[in-house]
């Protein structure tokens, strides 16, 4: 799945993001609003990980998203 599809249907994918990253709040996910870089930043911030690790996690999420 490509990010444009996720971005266009963010409300649908928010639940999957919440399952993958249980520490993210509803406010975090609303702030992301389908923006990939914002999601990377929020994951990095909440989990205290390096940007490249957060990027890898988001890429994994992108690859495994289900419509």
What do the PLM-derived regions correspond to, one by one?
Residues 1-67:
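Intrinsically disordered, low-complexity, hydrophilic segments
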């Amino acid at each position: 799945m490509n990010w444009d599809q996720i971005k266009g249907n963010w409300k649908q994918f928010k639940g999957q993001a919440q399952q993958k990253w249980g520490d993210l709040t509803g406010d975090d996910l609303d702030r992301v609003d389908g923006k990939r870089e914002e999601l990377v930043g929020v994951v990095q911030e909440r989990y205290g990980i390096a940007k490249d690790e957060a990027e890898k996690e988001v890429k994994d999420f992108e690859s495994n998203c289900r419509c």
